[in-house]
Regions:
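Well-ordered alpha-helical segments embedded in enzymatic catalytic cores
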Residues: 15, 46, 95-98
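Substrate-recognition element of Asp-dependent hydrolases with the DxDx(T/V) motif
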Residues: 28-30, 35-42, 47-74, 89
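Non-catalytic pre-domain segments flanking phosphatase-related domains
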Residues: 1-30
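A generic secondary-structure signal
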Residues: 19, 53, 98-102
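Substrate-recognition "cap/lid" segment bordering the active-site pocket of phosphatases
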Residues: 3-10, 67-107
Length: 107
């Protein structure tokens, strides 16, 4: 079984409180490459502020990356103070289901 995103936006920080409320979102699973990091490997501008603001509103976060570079994923997760899963094997469900359990979210 494959799992696909339900919402597509320009970048992660475009997920607004309005979108979260309209879609009853309780948690956000993020990728690293081209989601939290730009193509040039710099962190997406203001992603830490965006993440902290939503965490204050009760939104849970987890990084699920297909990368096997655990140190890179861990560094980003620690900066954002969120859990992470490296080598998540997306679009297969294993890493995403693990993130769902970590965040204690229903399917």
């Amino acid at each position: 079984m494959l799992i696909y995103p339900k919402i597509y936006l320009e970048n992660a920080t475009k997920i607004s409180e309005k979108i979260i409320k309209e879609n009853n979102i309780k948690g956000i699973i993020l990728d690293v490459d081209n989601t939290l990091l730009y193509y040039n490997r710099e962190m997406l501008e203001n992603v830490d502020i965006w993440c902290n603001n939503l965490k204050e509103k009760g939104i849970k976060f987890c990084i699920v990356s297909n990368s096997n570079k655990k140190d890179k994923i861990k560094m980003i997760a620690e900066k954002l103070k969120i859990p992470y899963i490296s080598f998540g094997m997306k679009p297969l469900k294993f890493g995403l289901k693990k993130a769902q359990r970590i965040l204690k979210l229903d399917s």
